[in-house]
Design a protein with these regions (language model features):
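Subset of Sec-pathway N-terminal targeting signals
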Residues: 1-40, 44
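Glycine- and acidic
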Residues: 1-4, 15-19, 195-207, 229-230, ...
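Alpha-helix capping and helix-loop boundary segments enriched in small/acidic/polar residues
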Residues: 6-9, 60, 203-210, 292-303, ...
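Extended, charge-enriched "interface" segments that sit outside catalytic cores
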Residues: 40-212, 228
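Flexible, glycine-rich loop/tail regions that form catalytic "lids" or insertion modules at the edges
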Residues: 64-74, 78-116, 130-133, 154, ...
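Active-site pocket-lining segments that scaffold enzyme catalytic pockets across diverse folds
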Residues: 189, 193-253, 563, 575-589, ...
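Cofactor-binding active-site loop characterized by glycine-rich and histidine/acidic residues
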Residues: 229-394, 398, 607-660
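Conserved phosphate-handling catalytic cores of large alpha/beta enzymes
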Residues: 372-383, 391-427, 432-437, 445
């Protein structure tokens, strides 16, 4: 009897489903079936060997082809992103092997055959032609998706089900399409207005990537419906002014005052360039939801603001929402050269799942203009994509053609839903171009003459989309012209109003958090402050931090350490640094203030001195004595060993302190001279933020053995 005769009697759809499961999660398949599929794959891969040919041909031909169609589907999932229509101004690079039928043991003659493998994608049994057409629309159109490296079956299943709905194509109503056009028009018209009114001035325009504006707008509206109340964003200079005006609601009047270069209202501030300033506002969405909008100030040093944003988001989560990650949404907008070339994105991504630094997932959007100042993308990275850092945390990546506005919004909403469901990072690679040079006074044809000839003739995304909606009879050419005119007229009014202003006003970022806290003058900084506390309170703290739980077993060395501390306080007049430090934290906690300390090995302390967090010997249960002073009526003490990073962690803690003026936030360098691993944070934020941005911060830095 043929050893595979049982396959003839079985339903091929069942085997197709099982083989698909095997290809995605081999260990989830019953061992005997896994061995069968491994044998089949081995036979296919080694089909030049006579024994392998025999083992494959013993499987019924109809089932062989069914399996090969499953392999084709799997290949589209894994490699379809390499063959997309995502680049508006360049031809795609060629990748091999491609998705041709012959690479899967199939031929054009099989196109009219019906395969049960269509069930895998939710389209039911279908001809190979229909299956391929569906796969092309899902994986090789304006959106390319990387996700098959994800190891969680639930996430894989969710992604695949979402992708196969409506062929992964947008399905917006007429009103939604008109709204996308409106936001695109704002983005395009804003840049055109600035280009006309402020000829040659640096603005780092968004031209070529204007679809970022409807994407961000869609995220804010949809996030509010998810329950998000705080939107925290970081981005560099490219497109920042456009985003400030058309997403965050900063008035054109304020922007134009900054362009006119007027003196600042307060002479004690040096200020900064207009595309570095932060902004905080309140927005009411179309559904009447209230959301606080925050875009953090940033320096010219690319990617630094990402770490700060993570810290701000974490602080808001803890301070206002009891850790509910559905209430705060962090978004970081990157440049393609920066996210690939700077080390900080890697450090930030590595933080995402750590207990002291997680924020419930970040949406990363790359405004990919395929050039870093003058450097071609082929010289800017070794990886295939600028977003390959996403694979560190197995985060999905959506590569999108920025000329396809609906695809951009569709992909962004997908990213938001993924983040809200799974609490994980997700990346969007927005492939566009840069209409001018790095800034508006730069000549890009020195280094990319061929590309810029093409860009000069290329329609902007608004005009492309307007033509589509006109063809669909959703708007008329007159409607589009009126949209443009109305927005331009509103900017003219703002410009006229700005000319009446004599001074430029810097509005402090997150001013509400710092309400009631004044900026300290030099004289105030030198005032002696009475920090004494009541002896009774100090004794209560000392008793708590020198008393181990009686029902726990600890190492003898820990028992001795705690005993020595008890004797220090109660039997002598001398105390070491660690005891003094813990007493200081304890009195603050007793008064209701939160304390956070993070850095490398800070829980125990690099020199085995702190032991702020103790481990029970047998269970390794974590004991924090400082949180047991008055459990129902005290501040929270948080101590976190950080990843081995200085740059990102100090940036994170700086952001945390920025959003927590009434807490003591400490970053400790492992050794004092290790602090220079975070030098940019010292130079651009800690030492300069107040002077540049009117931004206050209470970060405390400990430098053991520092100079």
């Amino acid at each position: 009897m043929d050893k595979y005769s049982f396959l003839n009697a079985a339903h091929t759809g069942y085997f197709a489903q099982m083989y698909d499961q095997y290809l995605q999660q081999p260990d989830s398949v019953e061992p005997s079936w896994r061995a069968f599929f491994q044998g089949f794959d081995f036979g296919v891969e080694n089909s030049q060997d006579d024994n392998s040919i025999e083992s494959v041909t013993e499987v019924p031909e109809h089932l062989q082809k069914e399996f090969r169609v499953v392999q084709l589907i799997d290949a589209y999932r894994k490699r379809g992103h390499l063959f997309t229509k995502t680049n508006p101004v360049r031809d795609r690079r060629t990748y091999q092997p491609n998705l041709a039928l012959e690479n899967f043991g199939l031929s054009p003659a099989d196109r009219n055959m019906v395969f049960n493998a269509g069930d895998i994608m939710g389209i039911g049994p279908n001809t190979l032609t229909v299956i391929i057409e569906h796969l092309e629309r899902v994986y090789c159109n304006s959106i390319g998706v990387e996700y098959m490296y994800i190891r969680n079956p639930e996430k894989l299943d969710w992604i695949q089900k979402r992708l196969h709905v409506n062929d992964n194509l947008p399905n917006f109503s007429q009103d939604e399409k008109k709204h996308i056009l409106k936001k695109l028009n704002q983005a395009v018209s804003f840049e055109t207005f600035l280009h006309t009114k402020y000829v040659g001035q640096k603005r780092f325009s968004l031209e070529g990537g204007e679809s970022l504006i409807p994407a961000l707008d869609a995220v804010v509206e949809a996030a509010a419906n998810h329950g998000v109340e705080e939107f925290v964003m970081g981005m560099a200079h490219r497109g920042r002014l456009n985003t400030l005006t058309n997403i965050f609601g900063k008035s054109g009047k304020d922007i134009f005052s900054e362009f006119d270069g007027k003196d600042y209202e307060e002479t004690v501030f040096d200020g900064d360039v207009k595309y570095h300033l932060g902004w905080t506002s309140k927005r009411t969405t179309d559904n009447g939801k209230k959301i606080n909008m925050n875009i953090a100030p940033n320096p010219s040093h690319l990617e630094t603001v990402g770490a700060v944003v993570q810290g701000i988001a974490r602080a808001k989560l803890e301070n206002s929402f009891d850790g509910d990650t559905h209430k705060v949404l962090p978004i970081i907008v990157h440049g393609d050269a920066a996210i690939a070339g700077q080390g900080l994105p890697y450090e930030i991504v590595q933080m995402a799942g750590l207990k002291g630094y997680g924020t419930g997932g970040t949406i990363h959007i790359v405004v990919n203009n395929q050039i870093g100042f003058t450097t071609n993308y082929l010289d800017a990275r070794s990886s295939t994509y600028c977003t390959d850092v996403a694979k560190v945390t197995l985060s999905p990546v959506l590569h999108v053609n920025s000329d396809d506005a609906e695809a951009v919004v569709h992909a962004t909403l997908f990213a938001l839903d993924y983040r809200m469901k799974f609490g994980r990072d997700v990346f969007i690679d927005l492939l566009g171009y840069r209409k001018y040079g790095h800034n508006e006074g730069d000549e890009p044809r020195f280094t990319q003459p061929k590309l810029y000839k093409k860009i000069a003739k290329h329609q902007n995304p608004r005009d492309i989309y307007a033509d589509q909606l006109i063809a669909q009879n959703i708007v008329t050419a007159a409607d589009v012209k009126q949209l443009e005119l109305d927005y331009k007229n509103s900017l003219e009014v703002d410009l006229k109003d700005s000319r009446k202003e004599e001074k430029t006003i810097i509005t402090p970022f997150m001013a509400d958090e710092w309400e009631g806290l004044s900026l300290a003058k030099a004289k105030k900084m030198k005032e002696v402050v009475d920090t004494k506390v009541d002896k009774k309170m100090l004794t209560e703290v000392a008793t708590t931090i020198t008393t181990l739980p009686a029902d726990k077993k600890f190492l003898r060395k820990i028992e001795k350490l705690i005993g020595d501390r008890r004797r220090m306080y109660f039997e002598s007049d001398a105390m070491d640094w660690a005891m003094g430090e813990l007493l200081a934290y304890g009195t603050l906690l007793k008064e209701g203030f939160d304390v956070r300390i993070s850095g490398q090995d800070v829980e125990r302390g690099t020199f085995s001195h702190r032991h702020a967090l103790l481990k029970a010997e047998e269970s390794e249960e974590e004991i924090v004595l400082l949180n047991t002073i008055s459990p129902e009526n005290q501040g929270k003490f948080s101590v976190y060993n950080s990843l081995l990073s200085e740059y990102a962690v100090l940036g994170f803690d700086y952001g945390f302190a920025m959003a927590s003026p009434n807490a003591l936030t400490i970053w400790e360098a492992q050794f004092g001279d290790f602090s220079n691993g975070a030098q940019i944070m010292f130079d651009q934020y800690i030492s300069a933020a107040e002077d540049k941005w009117k931004a206050q911060n209470g970060i405390v830095v400990l430098l053991p053995h520092g100079y």
